[in-house]
A protein has these predicted regions:
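Chitinase-like catalytic core of GlcNAc-active glycosidases
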Residues: 1-171, 177, 185-188, 192, ...
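C-terminal helical cap(s) of enzyme catalytic domains, especially alpha/beta-barrels
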Residues: 199-221
Length: 221
């Protein structure tokens, strides 16, 4: 199995983050620098600004010994500026990626062109807000069919504390049920978990759910 942590606040990589790196290395965990274009598209629409920001990202990954990059995005829906940004992000980060590093996209795969998709190692589908399995199946079908994402590259996403209703409208914890669907709808490449730290009082429960999900995907773990 391959475990990945995406740093959502990597712009402010601290000495505490650096201190965590040896433990991550020991566990074989890949640590990625997240470029949150979806959340910052308003300030990064200018190609020059985006290029300068990507230069800083690439330099930070090298300086801090990170294992690659993840990035978010939104479907361009014919918007030329967004399409240009998507192409630039993939072009620059894929070119900067060294042997053993990863490039991961988080979001709706329609943000990516066919060429861009070929340069991405994994796609984490934006299913963390999905509440029922019927919608989930449609999202997976659209991703693997219309968007052309190979099942071997596709991960599902689930948020801690979120519900996911099955075909019988029975409620399950999204993290554990989504792990089951990674197997039954594919098998797909894996599961991305979000918001693990958001609920202070349920941290122990969140970790148990993640552990159960890992055991579902990797029974030997």
């Amino acid at each position: 199995s391959l475990d990945i942590v995406s740093l959502t606040n990597a712009d402010n990589f601290s000495k505490y983050d650096a201190e965590d790196m040896p433990a991550m290395r020991e566990k074989g965990t890949k640590v990625l620098y997240q470029v949150d274009y979806a959340g910052r598209s308003g300030e990064l629409t200018d190609e020059t600004k985006l290029g300068a920001y990507l230069d800083k990202v690439i330099a930070a990954v090298e300086k801090n010994g990170l294992d690659g990059y993840s990035f978010t995005g939104i479907p361009n829906a014919g918007d030329a500026a967004t399409a240009t940004a998507a192409a630039l992000i993939v072009e620059r980060l894929s070119a900067a990626k060294t042997e053993g590093q990863l490039l991961v996209f988080e979001g709706n795969p329609l943000f990516l062109t066919e060429d861009a998709l070929s340069k991405v190692d994994y796609v984490v589908l934006d299913t963390k807000a999905t509440e029922n399995v019927t919608d989930l199946k449609m999202q997976v079908l659209n991703a693997t069919g219309y968007a052309g994402v190979p099942a071997t590259k596709l991960l599902l996403a689930a948020a801690a504390g979120a519900p996911l209703y099955d075909e019988n409208v029975e409620e399950h914890a999204a993290i554990t049920e989504m792990a089951e669907r990674v197997v039954s709808l594919g098998p797909l490449a894996g599961l991305g978990t979000y918001d693990i730290y958001n609920d202070y009082y349920d941290l122990d429960m969140n970790y148990k759910l993640v552990r159960n999900a890992i055991q579902t995907l990797n029974p030997s773990k």
